[in-house]
């Protein structure tokens, strides 16, 4: 492997802590031309689609069939949500606001230099480009915060893969901490409960609260992925915070892809069946999505709303993702602060004394270099 050279080490350069916030990603535009490379990158990730041993067959299906049919359909869906939370993709617009809020809150607890970047697993800005921007700012300690509350191989582990792939090419890697999950973090649970209470204060209490999470193939769970268990743990804690009985809420899984069995129950099939079971007023929240995106805005609030109403449901409302709510970004800040304990740039760090020490070390290094040069030549 060839390592990417940066610059020669400079004595006295000011180091920084880097905070890398990541999420899944988004196409550059709501067009089939932009969707094709985005979907290809996504569906070629072996963490997302674990194909049979004949991987060449999956590549053939992907390139000859899926990438010639799905981009146009996906582009139409993205056009429905584009600009809803800003000028472009909802996920990217919200993620940028989250980053700004987190940065402001985290900086208050750092006396040393701390730098921030946003990276998407697929599309732009990429994780690689975000890491390079942190490298340019002399980041020597790095915390990676994937905004996936529940761990899954297809999301969290894939993020780790992307971070590792870039850092493997660096000659000097930073000290690294990686947030694996936060599905039971008290601040996250309280933020979810607060959002539900606020929604119900305006829209009333439903017959049933559905907590819908992105699904994974049953095969992944059978092979050891803890994701469904962590989804159910989150839901149980939120229900306890709200004082809900077990018959007042349920957990479902959405966004199925392909023909194999995924973890159940499925969100769409569930919503179609609920009116016949007496559920006329339904509220849905998606706790696993840290920001609203195509899967929540279009799939839940539009498509699944129609399923419920066409089956006889009378009142449906979607409870938005936590997005850039203050209690959400506060919870994420708490997670970052907990994970960076012990780093010298944190609270109590004497930045001026550190600057003086670095200047002294640089001066001594220059003196030594001059002495060696005088004695031994170039």
UniProtKB/Swiss-Prot annotation:
Coiled-coil portions: none
Pathway the protein acts in: Porphyrin-containing compound metabolism; protoheme biosynthesis; protoheme from protoporphyrin-IX: step 1/1
UniProt catalytic activity: heme b + 2 H(+) = protoporphyrin IX + Fe(2+)
Binding site for Fe cation: 214, 295
Cellular component aspect of the GO annotation: cytoplasm
Pfam families associated with the record: Ferrochelatase (PF00762)
Predominant localisation class: cytoplasm
GO molecular function: ferrochelatase activity; metal ion binding
Top-rank EC class of the record's enzyme: lyase
Protein origin, superkingdom: Bacteria
UniProt record, GO biological process: heme biosynthetic process
Keywords: Cytoplasm, Heme biosynthesis, Iron, Lyase, Metal-binding, Porphyrin biosynthesis
Compartments in which it is found: Cytoplasm
Documented EC number(s): 4.98.1.1
Function of the molecule: Catalyzes the ferrous insertion into protoporphyrin IX.
Family: Belongs to the ferrochelatase family.
NCBIfam families to which the protein is assigned, alphabetical: hemH (TIGR00109)
Protein name, per record: Ferrochelatase
Native species: Hydrogenovibrio crunogenus (strain DSM 25203 / XCL-2) (Thiomicrospira crunogena)
């Amino acid at each position: 492997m060839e390592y990417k050279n940066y610059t020669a080490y400079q004595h006295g350069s000011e180091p920084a802590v880097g905070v890398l916030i990541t999420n899944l990603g988004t196409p550059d535009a709501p067009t089939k031309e932009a969707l094709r490379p985005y979907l290809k990158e996504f569906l070629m990730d072996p963490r997302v689609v674990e194909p049979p041993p004949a991987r060449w067959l999956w590549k053939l299906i992907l390139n000859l069939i899926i990438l010639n049919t799905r981009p146009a359909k996906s582009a139409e869906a993205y056009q429905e949500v584009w600009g809803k939370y800003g000028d472009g993709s909802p996920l990217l617009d919200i993620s940028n606001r989250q980053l700004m809020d987190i940065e402001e809150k985290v900086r208050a607890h750092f006396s040393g230099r701390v730098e921030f970047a946003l990276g998407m697993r697929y599309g732009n800005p990429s994780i690689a480009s975000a890491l390079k921007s942190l490298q340019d700012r002399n980041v020597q300690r790095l915390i990676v915060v994937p905004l996936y509350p529940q761990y899954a191989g297809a999301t969290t582990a894939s993020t780790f893969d992307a971070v590792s792939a870039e850092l493997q090419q660096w000659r000097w890697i930073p000290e690294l901490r990686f947030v694996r999950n936060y599905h039971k973090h008290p601040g996250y649970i309280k933020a979810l409960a607060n959002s539900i209470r606020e929604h119900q204060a305006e829209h009333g209490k439903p017959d049933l609260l559905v907590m819908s999470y992105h699904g994974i193939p049953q095969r992944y769970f059978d092979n050891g992925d803890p994701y469904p268990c962590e989804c159910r743990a989150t839901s149980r804690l939120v229900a306890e915070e709200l004082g809900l009985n077990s018959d007042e809420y349920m957990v479902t899984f959405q966004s199925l892809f392909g023909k194999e069995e995924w973890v159940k129950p499925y969100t769409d099939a569930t919503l179609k069946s609920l009116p016949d079971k007496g559920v006329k007023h339904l509220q849905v929240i998606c706790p696993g999505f840290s920001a609203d995106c195509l899967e929540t805005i279009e799939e839940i609030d539009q498509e699944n709303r129609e399923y419920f109403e066409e089956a006889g449901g009378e009142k449906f409302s979607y409870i938005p993702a936590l997005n850039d709510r203050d209690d959400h970004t506060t919870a994420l800040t708490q997670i970052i602060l907990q994970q960076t304990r012990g780093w010298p740039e944190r609270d109590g760090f004497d930045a001026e004394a550190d600057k003086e020490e670095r200047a002294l070390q640089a001066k001594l290094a220059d003196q030594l270099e001059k002495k060696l040069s005088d004695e031994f030549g170039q």
